[in-house]
């Protein structure tokens, strides 16, 4: 997994589901102390740990598996080619499963040309609804109404703004319109421990709105958050938008996604195509269609190198 919080959530889920079975589950990330990590690594090497969940920390030279049989890479779109190959080299011929809601163009192209198997899970969990997706220009009234509605049903809101300098200004704007709204700010330049505390506090419903950068996009599971507002949506890639939208709608409540962008007429052709695609493909299980659009817009990249998107200019290939 790409993030510490996501790794910890997976650890808790696995531990709960495998409770009572003779399978030890552990996790490795920067959140663990040196002593804890050392103990886990020792037990892993001796074969006492059946399932190890972790971030890029698993790539450390001190990580030794007794007999690695299966490698699962979650949120595959967040890893570069070299990192994924390094993961595969943990053991020769290890079975590998990569999972993502939106495969990056290079990975999707590998599957379409038959170099990798592709399985599509198009059936959502029971009692889930499509996320209502709307494109608006930046409007304080739209933002206020969206937050008020979510708070009226005791829900929570993600507000994504990728410019850290603007976050305090947006927080002041929300508190001016909704005085009783509890707003937290989170971004990647904060101390890891401070950021993780804010996210865990948000999970525990200590805040109504989490005003953050794209750090929230990687798989964090907060069923009580069912509205997401994405500012300057035209600046994000198609898979980024789909991943962020996927932070909501994880319960039996109707979820909403508001994409705030300048008028479509002022955007580039690619920017318009991205926003139109994310608005049109809002049904459950539509990630594969969005990935196909992304492949069409960005190109398949370099199948023999490290570029994971882009168009081949002078080199053809035959399948």
Report residues per predicted region.
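Structural recognition of the conserved hydrophobic beta-strand(s) that form the central parallel beta-sheet
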Residues: 51-54, 72-73, 95-101, 110-111, ...
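Conserved Walker B
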Residues: 49, 56-58, 75-77, 215-216, ...
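Post-DEXD/H (motif II) to motif III coupling segment of the RecA-like Helicase ATP-binding lobe
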Residues: 7-11, 65-156
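Flexible beta-alpha connector loops of hexameric P-loop NTPases
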Residues: 4-5, 25-35, 72, 78, ...
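C-terminal helicase module of SF1/SF2 nucleic-acid helicases/translocases
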Residues: 140-158, 162, 166-319
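Conserved helix-turn-beta segment of the N-terminal RecA-like "Helicase ATP-binding" lobe
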Residues: 6-43, 177-178
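Loop/turn-to-beta-strand initiation segments
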Residues: 24, 47-51, 67-70, 92-97, ...
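Conserved motor-coupling elements within RecA-like helicase/translocase cores
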Residues: 31-52, 59-68, 192-209
């Amino acid at each position: 997994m790409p993030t510490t919080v996501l790794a910890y959530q997976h650890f808790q889920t696995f531990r709960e589901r495998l409770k009572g079975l003779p399978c030890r589950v552990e996790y490795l990330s920067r959140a663990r102390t040196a002593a804890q990590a050392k103990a886990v690594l020792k037990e892993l090497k001796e074969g006492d740990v059946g399932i190890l969940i972790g971030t890029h920390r698993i790539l450390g030279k001190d990580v030794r598996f007794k007999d690695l049989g299966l490698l699962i890479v979650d949120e595959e779109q967040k890893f570069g080619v070299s990192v994924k190959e390094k993961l595969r080299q943990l053991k020769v011929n290890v079975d590998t499963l990569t999972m993502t809601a939106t495969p990056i163009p290079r990975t999707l192209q590998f599957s379409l040309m038959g170099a990798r198997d592709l399985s599509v899970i198009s059936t959502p969990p029971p009692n889930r609804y499509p996320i209502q997706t709307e494109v608006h220009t930046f409007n304080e009234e739209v933002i206020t109404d969206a937050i008020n509605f979510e708070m009226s049903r005791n829900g929570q809101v993600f507000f994504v703004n990728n410019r850290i300098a603007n976050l305090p200004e947006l927080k002041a704007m929300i508190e001016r319109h909704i005085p009783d709204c509890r707003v937290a700010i989170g971004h990647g330049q904060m101390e890891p421990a401070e950021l993780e505390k804010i996210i865990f506090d948000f999970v525990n419903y200590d805040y109504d709105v989490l005003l953050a950068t794209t750090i929230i996009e990687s798989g964090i599971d907060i069923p009580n958050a069912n509205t997401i507002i994405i500012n300057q949506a035209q600046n994000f890639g198609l898979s980024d938008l789909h991943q962020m939208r996927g932070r909501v709608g994880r319960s039996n409540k109707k979820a909403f996604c508001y994409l705030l962008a300048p008028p479509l007429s002022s955007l580039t052709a690619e920017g318009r195509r991205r926003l139109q695609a994310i608005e049109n493909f809002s049904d459950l299980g539509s990630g594969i269609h969005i990935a196909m659009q992304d492949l069409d817009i960005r190109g398949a990249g370099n199948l023999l190198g490290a570029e994971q998107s882009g168009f081949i200019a002078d080199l053809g290939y035959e399948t």
